[in-house]
């Protein structure tokens, strides 16, 4: 009843009215009416105060929510540098309780990339995605799907590069990383396949290999300014002189980043940061051209670049360009913000690419790694000309082959 002061006020008015009727106890009614009226007034004020407090509390909650809102929005719009999404059928591969070791294997991939390429890969997020197929996985870089594949979690992948052992029963497929013909086999077939000399791997290895090669192919995209700063700060601990000379007086961290990205784009390791920074410190006084500075660094890293291309006889097998081809490319160089590129007509470009295709089919390269040797002037431009069609071809200039290495020319690109 006390929750309704308006009702009490009405009752007070009624009693006051009754007190004026002849024969009624006027004084008693007036006293009671006055008491009820005062009570109604107090209750009304209390209710207004309580309502005001409730409104103020709601406003404070709204304000607090608004204060937190920017943080929540930032969490929603932020993207991971790199992440792996898996279908629910592959969850056991990442579940330690089920014997899965995917998390540990991916952590080892980051260490492997640091050792081999010298890059700092941020922690790779792994999560399930119910929108994927049951046994599908995708690798994303900054929110964009780069590669994908499907696994058979309870089977093994058997690969035969020669494609001669086609009698093995199983599910025919294509190995996702290198595009080799493969077969998913039962686990009890492993011994039979290995006796035939075939390569047999588990599903986790298939995914981890795919992830590793994806990181190597897109390392330049993963190397941001923050990662470069971390690398430079590490170098500064032991080699402060070269870092202090170079940064920030001669080059910014962003400019160093662009040089490192150029190297990684052609799969040149950046582990030897001291040599890289020494070269930049020497040459950035003469030029600020990022492409030219990259070429100077490549010259300084010549032995590092050539090491995996040299066979046991200290020789390197290469394909060269016909002087006419070199002349055409050299005479049509155009400079842009993205670097130097050859402005060649489509017919000539097609003829060069077709000749490259023919040469690749006829030449055997060490470790099956095609190497093209061109003049220093056109090396960056020739690389840009072929990289969309032949991204895995190594393009070297004469400056990048050490003097104690024999050059064996096994093919020539002509038009």
Give the role of each language-model region:
Residues 27-31, 42-55:
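Juxtamembrane/interface segments at transmembrane-helix termini
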Residues 47-415:
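Membrane-embedded alpha-helical signal segments
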Residues 1-41:
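Transmembrane helix-loop junctions at the membrane interface of multipass transporters and ion channels
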